[in-house]
Regions:
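Glycine-rich phosphate-binding loop used to anchor ATP phosphates in small-molecule kinases
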Residues: 65-125
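Hydrophobic positions on the alpha1 helix immediately C-terminal to the Walker A/P-loop
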Residues: 20
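Conserved substrate/cofactor phosphate-moiety recognition/catalytic segment
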Residues: 25-70
Length: 366
């Protein structure tokens, strides 16, 4: 089969998707890839006469079901076209199937996908190689929030509209949580940094070597509630492998669902690496546990993922080993930018670059 990667570009209102799509086409076409883009289906439907704010329940239901049907049909048709091309292909979806669920009650969503013969796991985990979520400008870059670039946008540029946009942003992230390659792209002081981050994440998916990038890490104490966080329990096991390579299995449980992911990191030089990950089934996961590194213990931790002022954080509370250790890690914050710490986080120590606190080393048997 041809080398085809299908990627969802999603996010809250006014997140920069339109500009990012243009940059993706220009950048990867220049590298020899054929790039297909699938337009945002709800916008097409709105322009065609669909009213997603209607009080007519039957009209709303049929409209949402048709939206999903057309989304999947466009993706499947584009995939068949891509298979006829003798060069590597990237299919970029301006939103994907799970975005539709963000606007529906769980009951209505399950009814629609049941009628169409799908499950949430199939639509979220099996159709796309990666999901890139661009954080809305309503969260951390309010000065750039506008509705002028999309006449179909329903969230106004006032404080009430900004709050609606922030909540929708969180709903979309929640809908995609569980995909093995979900990446949240922060807002940045310089919008170009946000776009470059998108290109970097897609390059990772394509297996293009990338510079080794150190995310900032801190030992912290949580002093208040974290509203709107996505909570999950993680079991992480490292496998035996060749020198210069790190292989891990991760079992992640959230909202009663379990996802298994296999990740490989291979260092090509002191400043360049390739990272690949794939979702696997329970049987393969349990089989591969037989290859567990005997010199390392399994890590168990509870994770809270959240956005604060346009920046994405992961807060890990370790259960074993190192019970009581709480580490806050930034995701995709540019080197020249400052970290916007939430008021409910007290930083005790900056451990960025401290190899003692790499998960791989925390797992070492004492």
């Amino acid at each position: 089969m041809n080398n085809i990667k299908k990627i969802v570009l999603t996010g809250g209102p006014c997140a920069g998707k339109t500009t990012a799509l243009v940059r993706i086409i220009e950048h990867f076409s220049g590298l020899g890839y054929k790039v297909f883009t699938i337009p945002e289906v709800p916008t097409m439907f709105t322009q065609a006469g669909m009213n997603y704010l209607t009080d007519n329940a039957k009209f709303f239901y049929e409209g949402e079901k048709a939206t999903l049907q057309i989304q999947l049909a466009l993706e499947d048709s584009m995939m068949r076209m891509a298979q006829t091309i003798d060069k590597p292909v990237i299919i970029v979806c301006d939103r994907g199937a799970m975005d539709i669920s963000s606007y529906l009650t769980p009951e209505l969503w399950n009814r629609i996908i049941g009628e169409l013969g799908y499950t949430t796991a199939q639509l979220r985990d099996e159709r796309y190689d990666a999901v890139l979520h661009l954080v809305s400008a309503a969260d951390g870059a309010e000065q750039f929030y506008t509705t002028s670039n999309n006449a179909q946008r329903l969230e106004r540029a006032d404080e009430q509209g900004l709050q609606i946009a922030r909540e929708l942003d969180k709903k979309v992230i929640s809908a995609w949580t569980g995909h093995s390659h979900l990446r949240v792209i922060n807002n940045h002081d310089d919008f170009n940094n946000k776009l470059n981050r998108v290109l970097k994440e897609i390059s990772n998916v394509l297996g293009i070597p990338q510079p080794v990038e150190e995310e900032r890490k801190y030992i912290v104490e949580v002093t208040g509630d974290i509203a709107g966080s996505i909570d999950s329990d993680i079991v992480q096991t490292y496998l035996t492998t060749e020198p210069g390579c790190e292989v891990r299995l991760r079992k992640r449980v959230f909202e009663g669902k379990t996802v298994y992911v296999h990740t490989t990191k291979k260092l090509l030089s002191s400043n360049e690496q390739i990272e690949t990950e794939r979702q696997i089934g329970k049987n393969l996961y349990e089989s591969m546990l037989q290859q567990a590194d005997p010199y390392r213990v399994t890590i168990r931790k509870h994770r809270k993922s959240f956005i604060w002022k346009g920046q994405y954080f992961e807060l890990d509370s370790f259960e074993s080993p190192a019970p009581g250790l709480v580490i806050l890690e930034t995701k995709g914050i540019a080197k020249q930018e400052s970290v916007k710490f939430p008021p409910f986080i007290h930083v005790k120590e900056d451990i960025t670059g401290n190899t003692q606190y790499y998960n791989y080393n925390i797992a070492l048997r004492k």
